[in-house]
A protein has these predicted regions:
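Accessory RNA-recognition modules of RNA-modification enzymes
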Residues: 1-225
């Protein structure tokens, strides 16, 4: 399905309630029996934070291309392409000329990746269709923009803000919500800040190294990561 687009018609407060129910259900069924949640009351201790904006926040999207060359989101549990209506969660302007009645056409059977980076630059690339459950990193054609997107993430530690630049292909994974990278980095610097006998941190998230600066700053600025 279209992921967040399927969810966008629901009021934000209701979305948050549904997500909380899903999360607490999973934790209760799968984590609680192990004992890792001992002393933790899911009804009281689970904190929530809503990232703004709640609509029009997605900075990157992967589209399918139908036999007629028109791009769009896929229907739920189907390979059919919805080419007439753009996803409501994509940031304004990202899909202009890409999806809709007057949009351009692309190579049938390919996938189109659209990214709007921190500088406001739109990148549109064409790739081969990915196999189910896999990501395609190879760019076949650059339609607009560059081979690399630039993301700038501010990290605040003890009132001092530093900005970190990340440059990587539009096909690489990055948090889709425009506010997510800075928010998640803030949680790491807040929760992980401490005095450590051995300054070694593990970024198990991987990717392009989004959390390396926040881990480093939380551990005193000179850890091994």
């Amino acid at each position: 399905g279209a992921g967040c687009c399927d969810y966008s018609h629901i009021a934000p407060a209701a979305q948050q309630r549904f997500k909380r129910e899903v999360l607490t259900g999973q934790l209760t069924n799968h984590a609680q029996p192990s004992g890792v949640l001992n002393g933790f009351d899911l009804a009281i201790d689970l904190e929530e934070e809503t990232l703004e904006p709640t609509l029009g926040w997605r900075t990157r999207v992967r589209l399918g291309v139908g036999p007629d060359g028109r791009a769009g989101m896929r229907k739920a549990r189907s390979n059919d392409i919805l080419a007439d209506v753009a996803c409501a969660q994509v940031i304004p302007g990202a899909l202009e000329g890409i999806v809709g009645p007057d949009a351009r056409t692309f190579t049938p059977g390919t996938e189109i990746i659209v990214v709007v980076d921190s500088t406001g630059q739109r990148h549109v690339v064409e790739t081969a269709k990915a196999q189910r459950g896999r990501r395609v990193e190879q760019i076949e054609t650059v339609i607009e923009g560059d081979l690399d997107a630039t993301e700038i993430v501010p990290v605040d530690v003890a009132g001092q803000v530093q900005e970190f630049d990340y440059v990587f292909p539009p096909t690489a994974f990055w948090q889709a919500h425009r506010a997510a990278p800075a928010t998640y980095s803030r949680y790491i610097t807040d929760w992980a800040a401490d005095e450590y006998e051995q300054a070694t941190g593990w970024d198990l998230y991987g990717g392009v190294g989004l959390f390396v600066p926040s881990i480093s700053m939380a551990m005193g600025g000179r850890p091994r990561i």
